[in-house]
Swiss-Prot record:
This is Crossover junction endodeoxyribonuclease RuvC. Homodimer which binds Holliday junction (HJ) DNA. The HJ becomes 2-fold symmetrical on binding to RuvC with unstacked arms; it has a different conformation from HJ DNA in complex with RuvA. In the full resolvosome a probable DNA-RuvA(4)-RuvB(12)-RuvC(2) complex forms which resolves the HJ. Pfam families: RuvC. Belongs to the RuvC family.
Length: 180
């Protein structure tokens, strides 16, 4: 199963692609999508188009994205939510099942503790995927989201893979459940 992880951000969105075969995780690719110094709609378009290009290039079976946390600054939270929405639109537009995880869940899955620092996440991602170098923070976070999904989202992914067929029958997957 090929998993695309996304760490959304208005200026920089991280992506990471891994493959899970049995209990083995393999690194495929990672990187960042940097938006131009432009108005909000152009930045969101860059995220949407770039995530779609990542999907077309690596052809993941499913995707996972980090949930937005409520920041001290409500405006920052709203902007992050819009960047996340642009990424989700690209994922759903490619008929991918999208799982969502909090930063706490990702840190627990990767490091073993929810209050881990970014450097600890980077280090564990490097170790878990046997990377020769330390990934950048945004790419490491995205790979962490993918790793979190690999550990906890297998059943959800299988259900999500059936989503196009279920839609033809008037059913859809919502919150890990089938609804009509």
């Amino acid at each position: 199963m090929k998993i695309l992880g996304i760490d959304p951000g208005l200026r920089t969105t991280g992506f990471g692609v891994i493959e899970k075969q049995g209990n083995k995780l393999s690194y495929i690719a990672s990187g960042t999508i940097k938006t131009p110094d432009a108005d909000l709609p152009q930045r969101l378009k860059t995220i949407l188009v770039s995530v779609a290009e990542v999907i077309a290039t690596y052809k993941p079976d499913c995707a996972a994205i980090e949930k937005v946390f409520v920041n001290v600054n409500p405006q920052s939270t709203l902007l992050l939510g819009q960047a996340r929405g642009a990424a989700i639109c690209a994922l759903v537009g490619a008929d991918l099942f999208v799982a969502e995880y909090t930063a706490l869940q990702v840190k627990q899955a990767v490091v073993g503790q929810g209050k881990a620092q970014k450097a600890q996440v980077q280090d564990m991602v490097q170790r878990l995927l046997k990377l020769s170098g330390l990934p950048g923070t945004d790419a490491a976070d995205a790979l962490g989201v993918a790793i979190c999904h690999a550990h906890s989202g297998e059943a959800l992914s299988m259900l999500g893979a059936l989503a196009p067929e279920l839609a033809k029958k008037g059913l859809r997957v919502r919150g890990g459940r089938l609804v009509g």
